[in-house]
Amino acid sequence: MKIVFLECSVELVPRSLWSHPQVLKSARRYGIEPGDLLLDKSLHYNAMAELPAKWKRGRPDILHVALLTTTDSPLYNEGLLRIYFQVYDGRLFEVGTGVRVPKNYERFRGLVAQLLKTERVPPGEGEALIRLHSRSLAEFVEREGRFILMWEKGSPTTTTYVAARALSTGLPIGVGCFPRGEFKRSTLRKASEAYSIMGGAPLKTWGVASRIVYALERLKSPFT
């Protein structure tokens, strides 16, 4: 079973913002170069004012909570759930088995900033906790198949139905991982089907993910 967090609001601070006072302040605080910082709206709100699509950027906290939620599930701990996430530049990363995502948000930010630069953590040889899987969503689809998309404009259904579809087809379940706005058209085109739950109400990423994982557990896991 596979879940992929799509279009995550995760990226390093763009070069155009390196000289902004808020970015420089953050860099001095953490003792690193501006280009090694993760873009974060809570720290760089004013700096982000002129960024294109700023409403979909600078929210790594959403991915943090989503990963904490999914990696804390029996399904993941039994080795039955594979987790992927797509960052802002389009790359997709795979979370290894048995990974303990840092509960401390600042530690998580540092880990993801390193990941975006080295494409695996820890860097070097040995087993990676998180590693690059695909350089684009198109490549991901080639390797893993088209995905079942959770989308508030999709066909209304239940999480049980979505979980059953994923189990019968072997396709990943895609969940948006950004604060507001729409999926890119290129993302929508790569979905095999799209469904909404809870009457199409807008739900938080981790809310959707937790409901889907629980539905998968009820259908698949012997311990639920």
UniProtKB/Swiss-Prot annotation:
Molecular function per GO: rRNA (pseudouridine) methyltransferase activity; rRNA binding
Protein encoded by which gene: nep1
Protein name as annotated: Ribosomal RNA small subunit methyltransferase Nep1
Binding-site positions, S-adenosyl-L-methionine: G176, G181, M198, G199, G200, A201, P202, L203
Keywords noted in UniProt: Methyltransferase, Ribosome biogenesis, RNA-binding, rRNA processing, rRNA-binding, S-adenosyl-L-methionine, Transferase
Record InterPro entries: Alpha/beta_knot_MTases, Rbsml_bgen_MeTrfase_EMG1/NEP1, Ribosome_NEP1_arc, tRNA_m1G_MTases_N
GO BP terms in the entry: rRNA base methylation
Subunit architecture: Homodimer.
Site, as annotated: Stabilizes Arg-59: D61
Pfam families: EMG1
EC number of the protein: 2.1.1.-
Site note Interaction with substrate rRNA, residues: R59, R100, K103, R107
Sequence similarity: Belongs to the class IV-like SAM-binding methyltransferase superfamily. RNA methyltransferase NEP1 family.
Catalytically driven reaction(s): a pseudouridine in rRNA + S-adenosyl-L-methionine = an N(1)-methylpseudouridine in rRNA + S-adenosyl-L-homocysteine + H(+)
Transferase in keyword set: yes
Role of this protein: Methyltransferase involved in ribosomal biogenesis. Specifically catalyzes the N1-methylation of the pseudouridine corresponding to position 914 in M.jannaschii 16S rRNA.
NCBIfam families for this protein: PRK04171.2-3
